């Protein structure tokens, strides 16, 4: 006994003693895997083979004795990390509080480990992730693993266990969406069609003599949607979004049909236009006519009334239209000319002093 007490490692290094006790330890319940045996015997001080070896168990395993060589390999090929004294003290507190849960040891499922359990008590899942649960005699957790939900159920089982309302239904909406999309594509105009319609609408509106404000007011009275002059202007300039262009196109098309059918007779559109803003219709001048007027403006920015009348007759325009155009052109020239510079009519007044046709109206 003195020799055994003085040299406890000789007891652990004896292979015959290990093999002799292994059969008995597999049958008896007090012996479990090495780490559990270390923790329980270290805490309770229960002699395992007649010798109080609480501290010597820790020292022998941490120094890499014969048992550590048999437990060095792991099915996951993980490094063999032995717990220190502080870890064992922490494990003691957890062991007293909850006998079911403790720190995971990589040697739990080793084939050579003592008291190795079959598959139901395995602490490693199919995905290779370890669980922080190991089995203990008297505190079995096999029922907890099987019925408590610690092991995640298969994907098929979890899907079947869901309520029919919570299950993800088969995506039948894609076929319907494609069908509706094909149907809507037949009615939705393309960008080229919208551009062509906007161009034709502007030409026919000017030809009929309606302003953009008249069109917006007529749409509000006839169809219940009031549109401003800015909206009609942006439609003609293709500055609206594609969605709004598609919504506005059928309304403007109906307005054109109504306006074409009512040409020459006072209809609701004419009455609506008369009830609108009391102002003269905006006059549109062609590019060629503007070129002729620009040429005359460079020669004489302030033409006489007789010259305005002859110019209006030659261009087939009203006299008032020509007069207003020259007035607007002079105002534009003032805005474009920096202060201090001579304006065109001042330059011409110095060069042509005897021209009687150039004087103020």
Swiss-Prot record:
Please give the Pfam families that the UniProt record associates with this protein. Answer: Homeodomain, Pou
Is this entry keyworded Nucleus?
yes
Q: Where is the composition biased (Basic and acidic residues)?
A: 165-183, 343-361
Cite the InterPro entries for this sequence: HD, Homeobox_CS, Homeodomain-like_sf, Lambda_DNA-bd_dom_sf, POU, POU_dom, POU_domain_TF, TF_POU_3
PROSITE patterns reported for this sequence? HOMEOBOX_1 (PS00027), HOMEOBOX_2 (PS50071), POU_1 (PS00035), POU_2 (PS00465), POU_3 (PS51179)
Location(s) in or outside the cell: Nucleus
Entry GO terms, CC: nucleoplasm
According to the UniProt record, where is the region Disordered?
A: 99-131, 144-192, 334-361
User: Which parts of the sequence belong to the POU-specific domain?
Assistant: 186-260
One Gene Ontology MF term? DNA-binding transcription factor activity, RNA polymerase II-specific
What are the Polar residues biased-composition ranges?
119-131
Alphabetized UniProt keyword annotations:
DNA-binding, Homeobox, Nucleus, Phosphoprotein, Transcription, Transcription regulation
Residues with the Phosphoserine modification = 265
Q: Which domain of life is it from?
A: Eukaryota
| DNA-binding region, residue range(s) | 278-337
Q: Which GO terms describe its biological process?
A: cochlea morphogenesis; forebrain neuron differentiation; negative regulation of mesenchymal cell apoptotic process; sensory perception of sound
What job does the chain carry out? Answer: Probable transcription factor which exert its primary action widely during early neural development and in a very limited set of neurons in the mature brain.
Q: Say which family it is in.
A: Belongs to the POU transcription factor family. Class-3 subfamily.
Q: What is this protein called?
A: POU domain, class 3, transcription factor 4
Task: Identify the species of origin.
Answer: Mesocricetus auratus (Golden hamster)
Name of the gene this protein is made from:
Pou3f4
């Amino acid at each position: 006994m003195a020799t055994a007490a003085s040299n406890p490692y000789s007891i652990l290094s004896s292979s015959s003693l290990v093999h002799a006790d292994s059969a008995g330890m597999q049958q008896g319940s007090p012996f479990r895997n090495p780490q559990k045996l270390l923790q329980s015997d270290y805490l309770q001080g229960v002699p395992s083979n007649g010798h109080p070896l609480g501290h010597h168990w820790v020292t022998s395993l941490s120094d890499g004795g014969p048992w550590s060589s048999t437990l060095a390999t792991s099915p996951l090929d993980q490094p063999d990390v032995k717990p220190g004294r502080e870890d064992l003290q922490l494990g003691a507190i957890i062991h007293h509080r909850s006998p079911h849960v403790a720190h995971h040891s990589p040697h739990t499922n080793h084939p050579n480990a003592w008291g190795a359990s079959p598959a139901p008590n395995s602490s490693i899942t199919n995905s290779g992730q370890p669980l922080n649960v190991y089995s203990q005699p008297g505190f079995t957790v096999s029922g907890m693993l099987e019925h408590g939900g610690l092991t995640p159920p298969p994907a098929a089982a979890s899907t079947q266990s869901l309520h029919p309302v919570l299950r993800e239904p088969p995506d039948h909406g894609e076929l319907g969406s494609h069908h509706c999309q094909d149907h809507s594509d037949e009615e939705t105009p393309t960008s080229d069609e919208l551009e062509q319609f906007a161009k034709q609408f502007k030409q026919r509106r000017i030809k009929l003599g309606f302003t953009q404000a008249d069109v917006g007011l007529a749409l509000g009275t006839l169809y219940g949607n009031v549109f401003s002059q800015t909206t009609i202007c942006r439609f003609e300039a293709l500055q609206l979004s594609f969605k709004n262009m598609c919504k506005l196109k059928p309304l403007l098309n109906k307005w054109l049909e109504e306006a074409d059918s009512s040409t020459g007779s006072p209809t609701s559109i004419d009455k609506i236009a008369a009830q609108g803003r009391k102002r003269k219709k905006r006059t549109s001048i062609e590019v060629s006519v503007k070129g002729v007027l620009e040429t005359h403006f460079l020669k004489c920015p302030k033409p006489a009334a007789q010259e305005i009348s002859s110019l209006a007759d030659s261009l087939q325009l009203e006299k008032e239209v020509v007069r207003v155009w020259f007035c607007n052109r002079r105002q534009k020239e003032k805005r474009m000319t920096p202060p201090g510079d001579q304006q065109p009519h001042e330059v011409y007044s110095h060069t042509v002093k005897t021209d009687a046709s150039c004087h103020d109206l």
